[in-house]
């Protein structure tokens, strides 16, 4: 039986943890006030980020989250995004994967949608 992937979602501004495993930023825009040198990232996978029109429409409005989730999952079926999603699956095969976002509410972010997809 295959091991269930250990996927975590955290804010990039939080202190890194030894349990984070591979740390991947999944936002399209680089986080304010953070230098690339102090980000403690494995990589920045902006190919899986929501499109700019979808991100602007959503605007982290909790009332729009379910519709955002539906639209974003549809975007993730596009070839370039699907390939990036598969890359994240590969990263999560053998060690924990922490998806990082700058949003103040990671539980209603693209990182949470990605984590749910990667866990299935």
Residue ranges and their predicted role:
Residues 1-120:
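Residues lining hydrophobic/aromatic ligand-binding pockets adjacent to catalytic sites
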